[in-house]
């Protein structure tokens, strides 16, 4: 779908500004609107979302990011700058307000981290290295009786952001959170004042992981995260000073979209790719990207090992009609944070679809690798024959797989649980709603497999969109049950020993849950695609409390902020507080740029 120039001009922040602006519209319309604004390309942000981006973000994408090889290589540098400024409505180099030292709420003191070392925490993606997303009552600092008294404590605006999709962490009484602008912030949990900021230079989507390091001159603790360019950073948790940066995967197609997991002095880093979004273009040499996991020394950033999901490097296959070389096998992006099993000395992670046909056996699978060497211990394929590229819908190019799969992936982290009888399980949740229990002590042998909700009459899956009734970014687990939200709407619970459904509650008709679930005794927390944060009873899913985040907020740092969809991340709970980001300007979500903190009042 091509937007008429007049309509495009009316929507842009710089509409009618100058002849140069009109030229910018022309380049955008000619080169970009084939995907942006076309319903067939649901993963391409529509123009109204792009208009909220900073010029630096657009220019970065055209020069070094996802769009560099899709369309950026067809533009001159002047055209890239023109498009960046026209679509954003801002001039390049004018976005300085994101630095902490430009904010009015700088903390007046920065006490040693050890003073708050005993405060309860939420660290990393899943609160623990088993990724259960479950807090004890003591660590949560809340009970079910406290939930109706939750009130907004503070709101922090992420400057120039359109997505607050990086899940915060709360450690040492501080909230660490990343932004799609590339900034990392350390906030005081009690007041929201900002201790420091760090600019990675590229979008950060990962949760923050905090761990001890042995680095002279540091505080002894680092904040670890990855960025869109597949860089991994360690910054001092006390000062925000960069301790080291590493690039564990040399392939330029790689990126990091999930949090690294810290265990025993090592970081286990998941590696995904942007190639799935670009490779249907006929001029693209499809496909070479390989998902995987890398292990780094947490104190130095040195790579200890790298294991790819595809065991062999891609080989030349054939050339398309344009003479462009095609490659394979490829794919298997890792979109989730690895899970640690100290008993088996193993790391577990889920893999994405293949980007070439036929699909490799380790695509859409759970893999177990040895934590010391990266050697593959076992794998279990959840969905077979899932070869997928964005843009391979009704109209397909020669680059598209011979048989296009449903794009199911394993987006959520596999979760390691110990049942009441002492047995252990790796639980896997999937986009189409399948839930599997594997035995980690029997090389991933299947124990049970169920569907969380069953089919929905009249609601059909679409490529690249979570299947109705499915589970996207993960569930929460105690010793007895798994608690989850469904992408079609409704929340439920399954018995971990048998897979039997314990309850399924619609909660709110028509609301989709595309975020991760969080729980503590008596309470399950979930954000919705329309921006509502909900708390339901763990026993039956009945609604206890809700808060509408899709509105403007007065922020402690004076940044204009609004909420949007709550997706990809989940709420965190620790030390009497619930914290969540609101805004998800992709996949049809509502943009937003606010981090919200709640407490009992």
Label the model's feature ranges.
Residues 1-22, 89-114:
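N-terminal export/targeting leaders of redox proteins
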Residues 22-26, 30, 56, 60, ...:
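Solvent-exposed, polar/charged alpha-helical surfaces in well-ordered, non-transmembrane soluble domains
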Residues 31-32, 36-39, 62-66, 71, ...:
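Sec/Tat-exported extracytoplasmic proteins
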Residues 40-51, 56-91:
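Axial heme c-ligation environment in periplasmic c-type cytochrome domains
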Residues 43-44, 129-136, 160-166, 185, ...:
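Short, solvent-exposed loop/turn elements at domain surfaces
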Residues 55, 144-159, 184-205, 210-219, ...:
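Extracytoplasmic/lumenal domain signature
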């Amino acid at each position: 779908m091509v937007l008429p120039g007049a309509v495009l001009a009316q929507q842009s922040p710089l509409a009618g500004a100058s002849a140069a602006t009109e030229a910018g519209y022309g380049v955008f319309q000619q080169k970009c609107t084939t995907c942006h604004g076309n319903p067939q390309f649901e993963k391409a942000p529509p123009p109204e979302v792009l208009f909220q981006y900073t010029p630096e973000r657009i220019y970065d994408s055209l020069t070094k990011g996802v769009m560099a090889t899709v369309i950026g290589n067809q533009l001159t540098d002047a055209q890239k700058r023109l498009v960046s400024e026209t679509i954003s409505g801002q001039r390049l180099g004018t976005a300085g307000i994101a630095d902490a030292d430009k904010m009015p709420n700088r903390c007046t003191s920065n006490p040693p981290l050890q003073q708050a070392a005993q405060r309860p925490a939420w660290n990393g993606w899943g609160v623990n290295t088993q990724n259960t997303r479950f807090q004890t009552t003591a660590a949560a600092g809340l009970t079910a009786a406290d939930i109706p008294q939750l009130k907004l404590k503070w709101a922090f605006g992420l400057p120039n952001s359109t997505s607050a999709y990086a899940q915060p962490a709360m450690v040492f009484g501080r909230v660490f959170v990343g932004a799609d602008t590339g900034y990392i912030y350390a906030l005081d949990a009690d007041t929201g004042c900002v201790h420091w900021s760090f600019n990675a230079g590229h979008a950060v989507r990962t949760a923050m992981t905090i761990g001890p390091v042995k680095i002279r001159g540091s505080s002894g603790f680092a904040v670890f995260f990855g960025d869109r360019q597949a860089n991994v950073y360690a910054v001092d948790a006390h000062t925000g000073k960069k301790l080291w940066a590493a690039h564990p995967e040399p392939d330029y197609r790689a990126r990091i979209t999930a949090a690294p997991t810290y265990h025993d002095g090592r970081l286990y880093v998941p590696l995904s790719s942007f190639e799935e979004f670009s490779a249907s273009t006929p001029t693209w040499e499809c496909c070479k990207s390989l998902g995987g996991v890398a292990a780094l020394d947490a104190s130095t950033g040195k790579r200890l090992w790298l294991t790819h999901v595809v065991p062999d490097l891609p080989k030349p296959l054939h050339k398309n009609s344009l003479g462009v070389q095609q490659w394979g096998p490829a794919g298997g992006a890792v979109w989730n944070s690895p899970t640690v099993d100290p008993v088996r000395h193993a790391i577990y992670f889920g893999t994405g679809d293949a980007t070439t046909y036929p699909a490799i056996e380790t695509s859409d699978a759970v893999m177990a690798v040895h934590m010391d060497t990266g050697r593959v211990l076992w794998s279990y394929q959840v969905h077979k024959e899932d070869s997928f590229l964005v843009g391979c819908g009704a109209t397909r190019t020669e680059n598209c797989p011979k048989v296009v799969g449903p794009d199911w992936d394993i987006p959520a982290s596999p979760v390691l649980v110990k049942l009441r009888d002492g047995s252990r399980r790796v639980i896997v949740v999937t986009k189409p709603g399948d839930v599997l229990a594997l035995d980690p002590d029997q090389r991933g042998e299947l124990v049970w497999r169920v569907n969380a909700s069953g089919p929905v009459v009249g609601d059909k899956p679409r490529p690249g969109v979570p299947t109705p009734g499915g589970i996207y970014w993960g569930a929460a687990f105690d010793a007895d049950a798994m608690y989850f939200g469904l992408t079609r709407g409704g929340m439920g619970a399954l018995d971990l020993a048998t897979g039997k459904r314990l309850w399924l509650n619609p909660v709110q008709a028509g609301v989709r849950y595309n975020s991760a679930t969080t729980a503590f005794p008596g309470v399950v927390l979930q954000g919705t695609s329309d921006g509502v944060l909900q708390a339901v009873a763990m026993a039956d899913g009945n609604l206890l409390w809700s808060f509408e985040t899709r509105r403007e907020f007065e922020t402690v740092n004076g940044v204009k902020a609004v909420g949007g969809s709550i997706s990809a991340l989940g709420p965190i709970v620790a030390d009497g507080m619930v914290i969540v980001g609101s805004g998800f300007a992709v996949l049809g979500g509502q943009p937003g740029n606010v981090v919200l903190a709640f407490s009992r009042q």
